[in-house]
Amino acid sequence: MKKKFVSTLLVLSVMSTCLLSACGSKPASESVDLTSVSLDTIEEKAKEEGTISSVGMPDDWANGKGSWESISNTYGLAHDDTDMTSAEELSMFDSEKDSPTKDIGDVGQAFGPTAIDMDVVQPYKASTWDSIPDWAKDPDGKWTISYLGTMGALVNKNNVSETIDSWEALKNSSAKITLGDVLRGASSQMAVLSCAYAMGGDAENLDPAFDYFKELASEGRIDVGDGSVERLNRGEIDVLATWDYLTLQYRDIVAENNPDLNMECHIMQDGAVQSGYCLVINKYAPHPYSAALTVEYLLSDEGQIERAEGYARPIREDVTLPDDLKAKMISDDEYTNTIPLADNDTVTKACTEIASRWEE
């Protein structure tokens, strides 16, 4: 659910414009000013609330289960989640503002500014704020990226003899590439954008990527099926382009379900964009202190390490991962030429163009 991107983002862009110009009714209750409250008070009030209700933060995404269990065990907060796309999360925040049920969400990087435009989020700066890169947070604290994904490749070595660690290597192989739903999938669109950079283009020049995929298509080397675990387990996919943490999760799942398959994970060395997911607190959150405490925990050393246990790389570079965990992840050496996507507007335009041109 978290991978759908452009079609719903376009809807939200229109929606946010309408909301800003319309004279809407006042919400049932004003939001708390979390920026003026001490951490001790937030923890005390959160324990009194006793509940945290999230959207788009499921157990099986970036070790969400481990994080929620720790939050529950540490602070006594009961948790429930409704999984949905980033656009749906923000739409729910707005549609429920008079009778809110959700406290916090996790949205794709490009949706952070959209959330502000829609005026459905409230600020909070965790105590680790200064260790978070400036590009990865709203200056006022209305969204904060908590973990990163980098474009990688999951390679079925039973099907592919070559080492696929770059778009050039893929092009020169006989392997088929699985991209998933390029019309609506964030990871799929980021794969195309990564290829553009690798082939000499960028977010404002996508032609090299489309030339690349046209050539692969002419050779019958684009697999139009999805990148599901079921297909991976059956050995139907040669190379799946997706976020690094998903390649590692899928590798582990396939190893358990079909030990005869040998899966290899790499970062695309000639073009690998890097993006993240933003924590956002509902402006109308029924449990605002619990939401702030959740943000605080997820950006703490413990919370960042737990994200890494789901193979998502922490946003905070000052967090030291345990050696046994680092050994399971893709080597740091493969991340030397990654491309952070700091300009959200440019990325949004690029994704819109990718979806439009891919359909052609």
What feature does the model see in each segment?
Residues 53-69, 80-94, 98-237:
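Extracytoplasmic ligand-binding site segments that recognize negatively charged/polar headgroups
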Residues 50, 75, 97, 174, ...:
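Sec/Tat-exported extracytoplasmic proteins
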Residues 41, 48-49, 312-360:
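An extracytoplasmic/periplasmic, membrane-proximal ligand-sensing/linker region
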Residues 272-273, 277-338:
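Mature extracytoplasmic/periplasmic domains
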Residues 31-39, 47-66, 277:
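Extracytoplasmic "Venus flytrap"
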Residues 121-130, 141-145, 168, 256-273, ...:
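Short beta-strand->loop
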Residues 110-114, 239-260:
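A ligand-binding cleft/hinge motif common to bilobed small-molecule-binding domains
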Residues 1-49, 360:
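Short, low-complexity disordered leader/linker segments with a strong preference
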